[in-house]
Amino acid sequence: MSAPDLKRAAAERAIPLVEDGMRLGIGTGSTAAAFIALLGERVRAGLTVTGVPTSEATRIACEREGIPLATLEELPELDLTIDGADEVDGNLRLIKGGGAALLREKIVAAASRRMVVIADASKRVETLGAFPLPVEVNLFGIGATTRAVEAAVAAAGCIGEIVRRLDKAGQPVLTDGGHALLDLRLGRIPDPEALSARLWAVPGVVEHGLFLGIADAAILAAAEGDQAVVSVLGRL
């Protein structure tokens, strides 16, 4: 069973959580894309929802599927957010931001009564950090900010390298908000809360990809033979 099949299986389990009339935060990334496609089918079948997208890419995908959209200014309180994750541990702590939408994703999730993660089971880890941790930073003073982030990482007991994210053409990636991304290749984050606090203390850091105390549940799809087996971490 392929990774896209598993992502679709996780998304299928999340679809029944969406009720008529909901105000829905809609995530970014390949698993969220599977959810958007299924949600579009439900909308065309008569489901009434209003979505708030977490990125321009998600906005375009939702519009293509005919999903009604609003901004967070228009709908400042959401019922549910469905989004993917790059890593999730047993305490529902996440690393997100591989799709460069971490700031908007965190704002939308924080505005929601509930956040449910959908992912294939390979994203489930014992300790966060194998996936590079994204840190969104202001372009002004990026050199000084990078040095301060390096010091924060060391003070939090982490070891690794920090690189600026580049696109496939070798150009620096900019977020939808016009900020740069640093990827922290740490391998292991022994104390995510400590690292989060250290990063927040750095002037120039706009947001980081540690989502702590935000997710309520994670739907994880694993392959067993040619079947997808879906498990739930937390409470749906």
From Swiss-Prot:
Pathway: Carbohydrate degradation; pentose phosphate pathway; D-ribose 5-phosphate from D-ribulose 5-phosphate (non-oxidative stage): step 1/1. GO terms for biological process: pentose-phosphate shunt, non-oxidative branch. The active site is at E105. GO terms for molecular function: ribose-5-phosphate isomerase activity. Substrate binds at T28, G29, S30, T31, D83, G84, A85, D86, K96, G97, G98, G99, K123. Its EC number is 5.3.1.6. InterPro entries: NagB/RpiA_transferase-like, Ribose-5P_isomerase, Ribose5P_isomerase_typA_subgr, Ribose5P_isomerase_type_A. It catalyses: aldehydo-D-ribose 5-phosphate = D-ribulose 5-phosphate. It comes from the Bacteria. Keywords: Isomerase. PANTHER family: RIBOSE-5-PHOSPHATE ISOMERASE 3, CHLOROPLASTIC-RELATED. Catalyzes the reversible conversion of ribose-5-phosphate to ribulose 5-phosphate. Homodimer. Belongs to the ribose 5-phosphate isomerase family. This is Ribose-5-phosphate isomerase A. It comes from Methylorubrum populi (strain ATCC BAA-705 / NCIMB 13946 / BJ001) (Methylobacterium populi).
